[in-house]
Amino acid sequence: GKSVCFQVPAMMREGIAIVVTPLIALMKDQVQNLNDRGIRALCVNAGMNRREVDVALNNAAYGDFKFLYVSPERLGTRLFQSYLQEMNVSFIVVDEAHCISQWGYDFRPDYLQIGKLRSLVDAPVIALTATATPKVADDIMERLGFEQRNLIKSGFERPNLSYIVRKCEDKLGKLLSVCDSVPGTGIVYVRSRKKTEELSAFLTSNGISSSFYHAGLGTDSRTD
């Protein structure tokens, strides 16, 4: 739903929209979805070598593309900024904008530098998130130079989703029961990297197709 808020306006304007997003998987998924619809989009991520990055940025600057997805760490590089001057930027988009406040002060400080793009590019800026508290929203606006009148909020109720808390003694047994009774694919969130691997092994040993994902995986594994 958030993507429509910037993809449709960007399609109506000349130039290319720069979309800042935190995760390679999310980046690739959105680029693939756009390309599948005949909308030219590309991305630059940490899994690419310098030659691939150079080609992608050259295409963004001189080719007929509508969207360029990048991580916040890419914005401050010399190579990116040299090509940025050649781009006809239609929008600057900060997707998952809560990361500015929640990640920027700790392990991804480049999130705090996104606002500097406004002095380099004369283009509208939009920041989107579905998980901002009032404090986080204020921090986002301060970091990006937004005024209070530019803040648009909507309700969080989603009639197609439900949150249910069930207390149980045998959590693993309950998980197996859910896997057996509920059709489709599910996601299980746990507290540690080690636990993701242990739980995946447990499910696999019980005949349930499973894999695990965490930040400690290599680029190839995370992409697959």
Regions found by a protein language model. Give the residues of each.
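Helicase motor core with emphasis on the C-terminal RecA-like subdomain
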Residues: 9-13, 28-224
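Walker A/P-loop
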Residues: 1-8, 17-21
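P-loop NTPase Walker A phosphate-binding motif
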Residues: 24
